[in-house]
Curated annotation (Swiss-Prot):
Belongs to the herpesviridae UL91 family. This is Protein UL91. Residues 79-111 are annotated as: Disordered. The gene is UL91.
């Protein structure tokens, strides 16, 4: 629960009351219903969504922020052609300060 509230604060999601948190949780629960069982109580939904935040969202958001805030990589130039790789690829020649910026398989442009 604390990690969920901390992430909501960090992401700027308004939650002045407990009801605001439950409304946000219900929206997430509906959008990601394929992850959960259909009939869950309100407190159980909150627990499940908090678990998703704790295990997935925090890592994904931190990875995205780390990739986008690297001072030597221009994200606007590389966003349509390559992505940061989690580990070096032997066939990829270009690195920037140890960060891999060119992958063996380019990513499709986002539309």
């Amino acid at each position: 629960m604390n990690s969920l509230l901390a992430e909501l604060n960090r992401l700027g999601v308004a939650h002045a009351t407990t009801e605001d948190v439950f409304i946000f949780v219900d929206r997430l629960f509906q959008h990601f219903s394929f992850l959960f069982q259909a009939e869950e109580s309100g407190p159980r939904r909150l627990e499940l969504v908090a678990s998703v935040f704790e295990h997935l969202t925090v890592e994904c958001v931190n990875d995205i922020l780390d990739a986008c805030s690297h001072p030597d990589v221009n994200v606007a130039e590389t966003s349509n052609t390559c992505r940061p790789c989690p580990s070096p690829v032997p066939s990829a020649p270009k690195t920037v300060s140890g960060a891999q910026t060119s992958c063996a398989t380019p990513r499709a442009p986002v539309t």
